[in-house]
């Protein structure tokens, strides 16, 4: 035996679900594996194994030849690695000038069989002069030594750089000094961009990717260290080697404004009062009203897109304008805190339940630039909606804040029956999870909102405003994205969030009451993009129609629907709302595009099977009502976003409703994010304690009578 220890490389995760076995790479690509390889991978996913351990564990399933053949195949494909069992965890060196000689010293230490004495390395740092550069060599940037050392280095005003020498990669930098920008700023983004990978490293006790570095690797590291030590910017440099070719990437770091290490205790503005200003529009643009063209937004923010050093990791085109018949879709990845920290400290098991540790959003538009800007905005919106821990809150009983607060019962109006059957509802869909019931004797954390209607403070439950906020470990409500939007300015974000509330209020009334609605005469809309989309969808076998869901606010709301002749393929749905009906229709069609890759037969348990069997007439045009044409809608838009907001406030006030906003903007993102709340509007998720969901369709003339809770559509709205 050669005494080697095998391990699953850290950019791979082993997944077993519903009888299928797969490997997931760090970019979330799935690879399914054979039954024979499963035996080995299952063991290596748990922990590293020596050859002796592997052979003993699989001797009844694999022959000696089969075992070594599979190990060699997995090594060649970069899934597993092997290394001598004895090794050190990390190494510290310090020098006035980073030279090849110093890295040769590193090589000598790396070549030792015995583990380097960590205490001795820390002891040596007592002699570090202020101008010396400390290089911390670790197996990988997920190593906890980096975070621990960063705190000490910052307090001691050391200049230092991390270095990782991997099988096929060199990681160097950034160079950290005593000012702003430290490893905590990097680690916050780096770890939350890939929480499952980071979790796997923590579980592995950080041994898996260390190896004896070759002289060639060490000399390359020495050269790279010299370059990065002189770099003017704080940057992480990654060198990848594939065969004889090498590829170099630079990833630039910005300080995290709320870093507890290098930024200290920063005062956090509470966001009230919210002062708005005139914001002239640039004219009609793809996707709605903006103060800046999509291309300009992308140019301004593209350097904030980075998989290691930023809040938004990647923008990946999924549907081009050609594939989307005039519309594009771009998927974006963002740094997620949702369950990530609980995942890392063992509070949850990522293999069980609905652990949302992968932050992925989608954007759409008629142009690729608009789809990219939309995806970037969606990512920043979701990132900013997370609870980080530095946000100001006030803990109080309901009676202590009731005069200025909005009750959770108004914001999430579940019925008594729904609370009594929480588990059954939770199994229906990802969007029908019902929290624990709250009563007024349970104190809550409250955050400040601002009423644009009354120009005064409104206390709002913190758990309603943010993702992943728990009251003493209990969820009395779940944060969601309803009414949250990102924009180039506050006013832009507020209008986008407001239109989202309007479209979902209308969709909830229609869906749960199964109300028949008239269709739009799509032939009457001359926009080339609309007609091209219809024609191309028809060539693909889809019929496309759109229903009018406009309510008493007279803000056009449209749901676009597409269906094939195959009854087992789910309908595709897309919603849109705007002061101008043509924009509402464009938005609905663009959102429908996000489902174009889902035109396959619905699996067992899919919502479509339940809806189809119930004869869903409400999904089709009402033949008794005339088709809607552009002249049937009024245009309430203006040339200034502030005036549009004032009109929205007036529309809500006329119906006895209040428009409230909460500023979620994070300074590191470059966009404004606002949450818009109108207590009393319905959601399109099933909340059957809401009086409006019953009475609203009757007042509109959509239905003849108020339905009972048992008569409402039991299928949750599908997104």
Put a short name on every predicted segment.
Residues 1-28:
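Long, low-complexity, charged/polar intrinsically disordered regions in eukaryotic proteins
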Residues 18, 26-116, 176-178, 252-285:
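Long, charge-rich, low-complexity alpha-helical segments
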Residues 20-25, 235-242, 333-336, 447-449, ...:
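Short polybasic amphipathic segments
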Residues 57-60, 251-719:
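Helix-biased "structured C-terminal domain" signature
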Residues 71, 107, 146-154, 534, ...:
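Short amphipathic alpha-helical segments and helix-helix/interface helices
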Residues 93-101, 120-121, 136-141, 164-165:
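Structural motif
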Residues 107-132:
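A short, well-structured beta->alpha microelement
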Residues 130-233, 242-274:
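E1/E1-like adenylate-forming module used to activate ubiquitin-like modifiers
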